[in-house]
């Protein structure tokens, strides 16, 4: 979706929850809350394509540029995650990933950047003791380490 007059258009942001899958069990997460007994679910590739093109159509109708915030659970765990990023790249759509840092390394971050990832949003829930209580022991230090991977990739 190459735009020649992009300076004149405003972005319309879509926050897109593509999967409930996550290998963390953060205390405050709605997906795994005690009253939520459903099995984790993910969108199929067909649903993802339909949603993607519906969002593009919406933006055409309302003269906006699409921008996606891809989230989940942890979106990188979706089996079609990289395929979706390929679709974003093919259409030159800017996107941000909202996920946890546990599956990031220099190679993954380099790939994210190559596909066009502009930002990677992760959480710090306070200082070490508070963050590790909400998430899991050691996660504060892992998060800080993974911020380095994100920075080195230029995200």
Where are each of the predicted segments found?
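Anion (oxyanion) recognition and catalysis
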Residues: 89, 151-154
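A short acidic, helix-capping loop that chelates divalent metal ions and anchors anionic groups
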Residues: 35-39, 128-134
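Gly/Ser/Thr-rich helix-start
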Residues: 73-74, 127, 137
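Glycine-rich S-adenosyl-L-methionine
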Residues: 135-152
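Conserved alpha-helical substructure of the radical SAM core
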Residues: 1-119
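Conserved phosphate-donor/acceptor-positioning beta-strand/loop module used by diverse small-molecule
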Residues: 122-124
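Hydrophobic anchor at the start of a short beta-strand
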Residues: 95, 154-155
């Amino acid at each position: 979706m190459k735009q020649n007059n992009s300076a004149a258009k405003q972005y319309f942001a879509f926050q897109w929850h593509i999967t409930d899958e996550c290998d963390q069990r953060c205390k405050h997460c709605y997906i795994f809350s005690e009253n939520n007994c459903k099995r984790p679910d993910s969108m199929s590739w067909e649903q993802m394509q339909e949603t993607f093109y519906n969002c593009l159509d919406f933006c055409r109708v309302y003269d906006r540029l699409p921008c996606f915030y891809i989230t989940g659970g942890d979106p990188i765990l979706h089996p079609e995650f990289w395929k979706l990023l390929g679709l974003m790249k093919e259409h030159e759509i800017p996107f941000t990933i909202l996920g946890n840092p546990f599956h990031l390394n220099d190679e993954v971050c380099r790939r994210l950047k190559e596909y066009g990832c502009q930002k990677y949003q992760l959480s710090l829930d306070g200082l070490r003791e508070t963050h590790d209580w909400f998430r899991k022991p050691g996660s504060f230090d892992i998060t800080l380490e993974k911020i380095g991977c994100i920075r080195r990739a230029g995200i």
